[in-house]
Amino acid sequence: MDNGQLAGNYCYKMFESKIQLTGRISGNNIELTELLNGKPNGYFKGKIFTDNADRFEGNWTNSNGKNTYAFKTTLSSACASDSHNKRYELLIGSDDEAEKFMKQVKTSIINGNKEWIANHISYPIKIKLVKGKTATIKNKKQLIENFDQIFHHQYKGLISASCVCNMFNNYQGVMLGHGIIWINNTPESTSSRYGYVITAINN
């Protein structure tokens, strides 16, 4: 926010794509313009409430003013960064790169790409096998051998339903959903040469 001017985005979950927003805030009143391909597509107009839960609610109207819908958003988590241009402030690399990697993680798990996942994990890593038994996977071979137990049907469902846009992040890295997968930079990453790796699997 700069002198009441706002800039940001929100995620269209179905397509895992970001829609850009610009607008202004005055007191508790907010007006936002939704942009698609740089052109106005709709307008949010509402108020911020902090009585029992931090929330923003009001009405969304499309660009021609013919359709209006009520909306309500509630704060679910805070971001470590104060810039919408660099959400994952503690990670080396751009937000797009981090989200692209998480998208590849998600797709590879759902499609059963064992080799790719095995090649992008920080070992050793703790996981749960069938019946809740905890185990430590020490290398790629063990990961591939236990892949179907680790990434079981129910867990894949949670991964499939999780969006890779605007993910929560902190000093531990970036998490998918409610912490079902965590990623971070590879240990040897530098500002000029870096990569990403899975650091936690909470199955």
Regions found by a protein language model. Name each.
Residues N113-P124:
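Short, well-ordered alpha-helical segments enriched in acidic and aromatic residues
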Residues P124-K126, N203:
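Solvent-exposed loop/turn segments at secondary-structure junctions
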Residues Y43-S63, L143-N203:
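Exposed beta-sheet edge and beta->alpha loop/turn motif
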Residues A78-T107:
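Short, low-complexity N-terminal intrinsically disordered segments enriched in polar/charged residues
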Residues I127-K133:
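A short gly/proline-enriched turn/hairpin at secondary-structure junctions
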Residues M1-N52, F56-E57, N67-T74, K86:
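Central antiparallel beta-sheet cores of small beta-barrel/beta-sandwich binding domains
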Residues K133-N146:
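A solvent-exposed, acidic/Ser-Thr-rich amphipathic alpha-helical stretch
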